[in-house]
Amino acid sequence: MSSIEELARANVRALTPYQSARRLGGNGDVWLNANEYPQAPEFQLTLQTLNRYPECQPVMVINRYAEYAGVTPEQVLVSRGADEGIELLIRAFCEPGKDAILFCPPTYGMYAVSAETFGVERRTAASKSDWQLDLDAIESQLDGTKVVYVCSPNNPTGNLIARDDLRQLLTLAQGKALVVIDEAYIEFCPQASTASWLAEFPHLVILRTLSKAFSLAGLRCGFTLANPEVIQLLLKVIAPYPLSTPVADIAAQALSHEGIAKMKANVAEVTTNRRWLSDILKNIPCIEEVFHSESNYLLVRFTASPSVFKTLWDQGIILRDQNKQPSLAGCLRITIGNRYECERVVAALQSLPGINA
């Protein structure tokens, strides 16, 4: 071990970084592995003040997002993607070596990575066979747990968590832990949002992003919705200038009435393509099951997923392998691209009838 490595914290030396889609690489021309929107939006910068430091919490961005989400500006914090929100909650509420977070695999990987980075215990309550919450398993681990992360729609399975279960979880956790509902994909099923519950549950926190339906993954802009007491605590640990001036400028434009209308058009296109792709995939021989999705991706179980993954990879079609996730053996996740990209996937898979593991 080098002397520099010896200086690092032991948990960081042992840490396996999150394997993001870009980190995994690939040389494709059909990128369906990161749940991005397939077409880049066009914006013109309007703020010519790059010689000045930006606002810590840009007022126009906060106000517009509050209006969009149906909350007050005091209930909104903006950050460098929702991933920073995940991290801020751990920094503000969890004592390393003492407290724990809890999440419900199979689910998004950054909850675990963020906790491990800060030396905070990671607890899991595996989802049931239908990928709904195992409330008994969660309740049995709440002592010493400060933050419970629930993703709905869940990534990578695509299902919504039952609203009655979410309410029951909030009741179980009252006075013990924050319940953080990750709504990164909520624009694809807005009726399922829990933002209206904030007045009822002071320990509810909601994560949002502009990366998915707003087609701004490269912007790195996310939001935390919570009661003002929580927001004020997070403001104590966030960086002094989390959003650059160009990011705030574009985010404000994306949250204008025109920008929100464009987002809704994106959602309509994705929903149409998802339905089309799902219906066709169900009749392809190398596919065992296409799971219902409320998001911009489909989870699919294949008869021989490693062969399928490599075959499509070699054709420049990059999917996301989910085999290492609990209960997802044989599964690949397919982002819903434009119609041409969906057709490329179908053509590649239809050439693989009767593939063997």
Swiss-Prot record:
Q: Which Gene3D superfamilies match?
A: Aspartate Aminotransferase, domain 1 (3.90.1150.10), Type I PLP-dependent aspartate aminotransferase-like (Major domain) (3.40.640.10)
Q: CDD domains this protein is in?
A: AAT_like
User: Which cofactors must be present for this protein to function?
Assistant: pyridoxal 5'-phosphate
Does Phosphoprotein show up as a keyword for this record? Answer: no
- InterPro entries from the UniProt entry: Aminotrans_II_pyridoxalP_BS (IPR001917), Aminotransferase_I/II_large (IPR004839), HisP_aminotrans (IPR005861), PyrdxlP-dep_Trfase (IPR015424), PyrdxlP-dep_Trfase_major (IPR015421), PyrdxlP-dep_Trfase_small (IPR015422)
Q: How does it assemble?
A: Homodimer.
Identify this protein by name. Answer: Histidinol-phosphate aminotransferase
Q: Which organism is it from?
A: Pectobacterium atrosepticum (strain SCRI 1043 / ATCC BAA-672)
Q: What is the lineage of its organism?
A: Bacteria, Pseudomonadati, Pseudomonadota, Gammaproteobacteria, Enterobacterales
Q: Which gene encodes it?
A: hisC
